[in-house]
Structure formats: structure tokens, C-alpha cells
Amino acid sequence: MRHYEIVLLIHPDQSEQVPAMLERYKGMITAGGGKVHREEDWGRRQLAYMINKLAKAHYLCLNIEADQAVMAELEHAFKFNDAVLRHLTVQKKKADTAPSSMMKTVEREEARKASQTEQA
């Protein structure tokens, strides 16, 4: 089995369905004999450029271990899900379980917002 990192950009109006979508994709991975090593919800973030006249998207990152049949099934599911604006799959040499630099940035922003609300 190979290790992959998947980043999904979800339509911002579908943010409520993100947990259900994530569970469905994780179910597909585990049903095919794969493992989810890391899942990160980066939240709604500004896009670098407009996609389908949208300036923001909900970001998800998954680090998984799966075979090629499961990956083909996932790619097929991403393509035919209208809520998925873009997806990127990168093959990795080993499983990443530590928080990504993007997740550290998200946590830092949340801590800053929390301290601002406490001061107010």
C-alpha cells in the first residue's frame, strides 16, 4: 500500500456537510483495507484566485495509506461530487502523523481570536 496526502477544497455553502463527507470518504478508505493516518479540517479560507466565482472555500487535508483501487474510487467520488471544487492527491514516501504547518497556522489564528475576545 502507498501513502497519500489529499487536499480538498469544498464549496463554502456546503460547510455543514463537511463532517458527513469526511466520514463517507474515510469509510471508503477503510472498506478498501486502507488507513487514515491524519485528518485536518483547516476551515474556511480565502482562495488565491476565484474558482467558480467563489473567493473562499472550506479546506480538508487527509493523510492516508491505501492501494490504487481505493484511490481510483476516491478520485471518481471527488470528480462527481459537486461540492468538491478542487482536489489534489500527492503520493508520499511515508505516513505523516504530525500536524501540518497549515494546521499550526489555523491553531495560532484560533488562539489569537480567543485572546482578543477575552480582552474585549
From Swiss-Prot:
Keywords: Ribonucleoprotein, Ribosomal protein, RNA-binding, rRNA-binding
Domain of life: Bacteria
Basic and acidic residues biased stretches: 105-120
GO biological process: translation
InterPro entries membership: Ribosomal_bS6, Ribosomal_bS6_CS, Ribosomal_bS6_sf, Ribosomal_S6_plastid/chlpt, Transl_elong_EF1B/ribsomal_bS6
Presence of the UniProt keyword Ribonucleoprotein in the record: yes
GO molecular function terms noted in the UniProt entry: small ribosomal subunit rRNA binding; structural constituent of ribosome
Residue numbers spanned by region Disordered: 93-120
Pfam families from the UniProt entry: Ribosomal_S6
PROSITE patterns documented for this protein: RIBOSOMAL_S6
GO CC, any one term: cytosolic small ribosomal subunit
Purpose: Binds together with bS18 to 16S ribosomal RNA.
Annotated family: Belongs to the bacterial ribosomal protein bS6 family.
Protein name stated in the entry: Small ribosomal subunit protein bS6
Organism name: Delftia acidovorans (strain DSM 14801 / SPH-1)
Gene name in the database record: rpsF
